[in-house]
A protein has these predicted regions:
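Short acidic/polar alpha-helix capping motifs at helix-coil junctions
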Residues: 4-8, 17-18, 93
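Short, conserved charged micro-motifs
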Residues: 13-19, 64-67
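An amphipathic, aromatic/His-enriched active-site/gating alpha helix that lines ligand/cofactor pockets
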Residues: 23-40, 58-93
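A general secondary-structure junction signal
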Residues: 45, 92-97
Length: 104
C-alpha cells in the first residue's frame, strides 16, 4: 500500500464546495478511479482549525501512482487549476508505505 497525505487551507465560505470536490464522490476520486490500482481516499477536517483539511489517498504501489500521474497529467492539472479558488494553499505532507498501523 502506498499513501499520499495532502493538507489544505480552505477559504472561508468554500468549505461545502471543497468537501464536495474532495469528498468520496468528488471530482478527484472520479479521476483517480480511472486507475485499477487506486484504492480510495479519506477526507478529514481538523476540528481545532476548521478551515484545515487533509486528504489521504491510497494506491496499491508507488509506481502505479506515478504511472497514473504520467498518464493523466493534463486532466490532473486541469482539475487542480479549476479548484484553486477554494483554497489559500495546499501541500503534500508526506507519501510512502506505512510500516504499521497504530490504534489509539
Amino acid at each position: 500500500m502506498f499513501v499520499i497525505l495532502w493538507e489544505f487551507e480552505v477559504k472561508p465560505g468554500s468549505e461545502g464546495s471543497f468537501e464536495k470536490v474532495y469528498g468520496p464522490a468528488g471530482a478527484w476520486v472520479q479521476l483517480f478511479q480511472r486507475d485499477p490500482h487506486y484504492r480510495g481516499s479519506k477526507l478529514l477536517r481538523d476540528v481545532a482549525q476548521p478551515l484545515h483539511y487533509y486528504t489521504i489517498d491510497y494506491w496499491d504501489f508507488e509506481f502505479a501512482y506515478r504511472d497514473f500521474l504520467n498518464r493523466y497529467q493534463s486532466a490532473y492539472q486541469e482539475l487542480d487549476r479549476s479548484f484553486e479558488r477554494l483554497t489559500f494553499r495546499e501541500r503534500q505532507v508526506l507519501s510512502g508505505v506505512p510500516e504499521q498501523s497504530v490504534v489509539l
